[in-house]
From Swiss-Prot:
NCBIfam families: PRK00010.1 (NF000585). One of its GO terms (cellular component) is ribosome. The gene is rplE. One of its GO terms (biological process) is translation. This is Large ribosomal subunit protein uL5. SUPFAM superfamilies: RL5-like. GO terms for molecular function: rRNA binding; structural constituent of ribosome; tRNA binding. Gene3D superfamilies: 3.30.1440.10. It comes from the Bacteria. Keywords: Ribonucleoprotein, Ribosomal protein, RNA-binding, rRNA-binding, tRNA-binding. PANTHER family: 60S RIBOSOMAL PROTEIN L11-RELATED. It holds the Pfam family Ribosomal_L5_C. It comes from Mycobacterium avium (strain 104). Belongs to the universal ribosomal protein uL5 family.
Amino acid sequence: MTTTEKVQPRLKERYRNEIRDSLQQQFGYANVMQIPTVTKVVVNMGIGEAARDAKLINGAVNDLALITGQRPEIRRARKSIAQFKLREGMPIGARVTLRGDRMWEFLDRLTSIALPRIRDFRGLSPKQFDGVGNYTFGLAEQSVFHEIDVDKIDRVRGMDINVVTSATTDDEGRALLRALGFPFKEN
């Protein structure tokens, strides 16, 4: 029987070997547990049209599963809204929460492959932090990920990506994500 060594994601290795030390020097943390890290990444795809056609949710679930490597949770309406012809319990979106190695691999693919493939991309807005170091942004189409076959797309779907960090301020979160390779616009 051969023993195989578990390979760490390359972004996680870079964080442990380089980024942690530079953040500790930059902000002068006394304790290594104060150094901010990425806690989780939540990828959400809202499909409002699924209220009228329930088959649309399957395409979104399949796309999210291909992109993240994890089966999405189908989100249902919490209450009925007559103007949107929406009833309580109808499927209206899909969500995936990534943690651990899958999270690091997704962030690596996002920063090195997906974001550079966006047409007319000038960088991410540095103003979309929530006040405690978490970052939220949206992608207009799922085809920027190389896992999605462009010829098999039935409809263009966007998604929201929330990067949750253990940072306590926006400056710490911005420094962490910039070190991880997020291309922020310069003001």
